[in-house]
């Protein structure tokens, strides 16, 4: 029994010496004693290859490469002890979840923390750490007693409570495992116990290579190996000079020196012979003088400079994507020009979550075979999501999001269905569920679902159309596709008495959905498309899910568990599932994490993402215990993993390892911005490298090739997939600026695409965008007639929409596009309710031959409640009756109608105008409808403007009859003559024209009527500010002012007084007008003469004719208006359709100039030739 150390700096040949010794031994004595070669887990594959890579050694039974965990399996299979069931990380998390849930009421700190994402991952890591450092539950309990007895400050009490919780959970976890299960850490403890019984290890020649430190648990394994083996050889990266000096924590080799001393101490304790240490002084790894200099002088202060050409390259990239593309281009150059193999190259990084997706995409585009040494979570796989969401459906009462997350996995679809068709149908089905607010009992009820197209509050005929019946049948068929398998599992879960039966319900759910066959189909499809990584994913995920169910049953099978806990435990297990890495092929670029990688035999290393806070790493407190808490435990005798401070001290060694992997070339790079454009800073480590290699230039990498020389641009020509984007970039620059530059070279590349049989069609789709103009071509007469018909019948709102944006009109009225209907109460729904409520009250008053003025306050309250109760079941599929929140909203809406009724009562008392009709249709056909506003367009098309007028008021005096329009609005609005001029506000003047043209309808003896004005009535329940001693009358007066109607009224003092008979001088509280003492109107009055009203009405006719002409002639320009801070696009539903983009030459707003009313009126006169 002896111990031998082989030490040396990085690249000195320690591993090579050991491998050569093993290979020589195998040649000399192929059937001798066992040779064990122990390495970290991530080194096993490459070490096995290196061991049998010699021409003289093609295989061996005598020598085996192991990690500690694999050695544990080997020994336990030999001597026994492996009969207990192994539980993996997912099983550990599930067991911990169950323990925490059952212990929740007794936990002090973790009761609420258990609900946070990542809690069980941290808890599992903490328990694993306890085990690695030989800390037992009783040790933790003793620590709690000690802390609890001496806790005085809040921080000390918090730590004591935290340790108490950890002790409870750790003890429960260990009790659950005893005699039944083994987790990964238990195998190592068993290995310690069983090694003395192993004949396989007894007398073996043992090599331990690639480690820098050992946990106490691993150190115990090393102890037993030294006792059992013939000789143990351990390699450590240490400079021999370091061993001759006192240990200093700032020394580069501090960590490995401590390891060296610990192992020697163990050897002394066990009286193991310590052979003479073998120091290696040469640097055989480095073929480059610059890299040899970097290794030899890495820790030197001040930095030793290397003068001359260096094989070290530094790049700064514009952004992360540019950095990765730069790496890809250089890898292709090394392979093409310098005869590198892909396996000779490695990419090292730390923040993989920012890089991996980009690297997968770009390396694939550049045709670079690669292997990412990182396990991927299974959480996003359709199978995992299907199980998780299906359980959420059941435990969460069939919420919309859970249901359609499950649907979108496509595993609920019948096996033989055409997926494209089913996707379209499910999209329609989802729209139905959103529109009808389907969730909860609606899913579980046996009653069939109904489908009715929502029309209006007045549509109560109840007749179902053929298309509605057909849609109803489809909806119920699709409901069955979703509902049937989940309901079946729900019933089984509710009947289940044990966890085993619950797991069986999940398994049967998957089997009855034919999930294995569906996954096999996905695997075949992935293989056919050449995506072999995803093909293996579909195989792995089924095996892992089945293993998870087996583990669940093995651990907790006979226990009873609530559905919610079962769902939580299962979700925790599913979250922990990971795809196993497929071993790399013989020729791939290795992409690995700096902290975990153990590379060898690479010629070139790319270290990317070297940004401040990443390399070196910024201090971060992660996990269950903070650094301060770890220090307290350490002082009390419990050794745990290094603190952040210790980790930062080790960071220099990590970076040293990172830059000494390559034999020929080192590339270091950092991006100046991340994928979202956020600024990043270069690491101070780059400055250190620059000081060591002052002749190395920092090269800037960009995605924009325009600023590069011709020779530099040539390097951007890689694969056809990648190069196409750069061709586009160059030609776009040429098109926009006419810049020639290196365009002759890019034209050659362009010619390749347009002449290549393989790329002609693919590239044409991309290159066509070069000449893309986001312009909507005018519709032909034939198409226009097909879309709109030979007779146009449209509302005033439709005409206004055309003037806001012709393309939006085309999308809505030509293509009939609309947003999906969602079960929610929007402003239009509330507006419709207000209109209907006031109409019902007014209709009742007309039937009773009463006016608003006749109502009492109590009647206003009663009537508002009655009409809201009548309307609520008719509005938006009974949305106001669907929940407590909406019921509360119904009460608030009733209060608004009540307040509005009081104001209308006050208005009626003060006005000579009385309502004579409500919701007056024109051009709608049927009894009571006024005729439409008709136009014969120059191209022969007939156009009718139709609509419905909220309220018509009439007043009479000795000067004649006057009619005015009142329009109810749920928001404040005024009549802007500028918007009238631009055709954006035509509604009120159109209504006034219609009623005055048909005045005989409301006049007993026939005759004509004059326009009195148009006014907006704002329906709301305002809050007013008054003095503390204000009377109720004063408060009511202030509220009345908030209801002042805005609009445009006839500039006749007598007519204005008819609208407000309390007005003598000053401003009216009812309308936006006021009188001076001399009887003239105040400056702020919104008035127009009768002649001006006539001009406005003529202008409205003129505008409609122009709109009709443009519609029928196919005008669909993408030309939205913009006036001040208002724009047509602000609330437009069709932005994703027109793709309006101001950066495009053809896409510009029609900027409308704001004008005073007098200016606008003058322009209107000019248009119609009015006086």
From Swiss-Prot:
Domain UvrD-like helicase ATP-binding intervals: 1-343
Keyword 4Fe-4S: yes
Record flagged with keyword DNA damage: yes
Sorted UniProt keywords: 4Fe-4S, ATP-binding, DNA damage, DNA repair, DNA-binding, Exonuclease, Helicase, Hydrolase, Iron, Iron-sulfur, Metal-binding, Nuclease, Nucleotide-binding
Matches recorded under SUPFAM superfamilies: P-loop containing nucleoside triphosphate hydrolases (SSF52540)
Annotated HAMAP family: AddB_type1 (MF_01452)
Subunit structure: Heterodimer of AddA and AddB.
Protein name stated in the entry: ATP-dependent helicase/deoxyribonuclease subunit B
Source species of the chain: Bacillus cereus (strain AH187)
